[in-house]
Amino acid sequence: MAYDKQALIDQLGQLTIMELADLIDGLKETWGVTAAVAAGPAAAGPAAAAEEKTEFDVVLVDAGASKINVIKEIRAITGLGLKEAKDMSEKGGVLKEGISKDDAEKIKAQLEGAGAKVELK
């Protein structure tokens, strides 16, 4: 049985909504199907969230009230001179870049023990 697809589309386009609903119900009964929407693929979470970060930067946010102790810790951690460590304690910024999580947490604990506010990024 040959059919003209365009003629069929034109005929369906002339049907009212009620006639289309009856047609759909008739097709469901004849073929034994339901008009369920196919589910798309499940959206995966962001790749960055799935992977654990391996390199961290230790950032000094604030030296706190006991700047002398913080300066001593900065010198011990970075190997900077007294003036550079003092400047770092006043300005803040990145103390260490690209280090492991364990090392970053140790440094953070040292600096917080001295009274500084530190972030890991």
Curated annotation (Swiss-Prot):
Keyword Ribonucleoprotein (UniProt): yes
Single GO molecular function: structural constituent of ribosome
Matching InterPro entries: Ribosomal_bL12 (IPR000206), Ribosomal_bL12_C (IPR013823), Ribosomal_bL12_C/ClpS-like (IPR014719), Ribosomal_bL12_oligo (IPR008932), Ribosomal_bL12_oligo_N_sf (IPR036235)
Pfam families: Ribosomal_L12, Ribosomal_L12_N
Xref: Gene3D superfamilies: 3.30.1390.10, Single helix bin
Keyword field: Ribonucleoprotein, Ribosomal protein
S-S bridge residues: none
One of the record's GO cellular component terms: cytosolic large ribosomal subunit
One Gene Ontology term from the biological process aspect of the record: translation
Job description of the protein: Forms part of the ribosomal stalk which helps the ribosome interact with GTP-bound translation factors. Is thus essential for accurate translation.
Subunit structure: Homodimer. Part of the ribosomal stalk of the 50S ribosomal subunit. Forms a multimeric L10(L12)X complex, where L10 forms an elongated spine to which 2 to 4 L12 dimers bind in a sequential fashion. Binds GTP-bound translation factors.
Family listed: Belongs to the bacterial ribosomal protein bL12 family.
Protein name: Large ribosomal subunit protein bL12
Gene that this polypeptide is encoded by: rplL
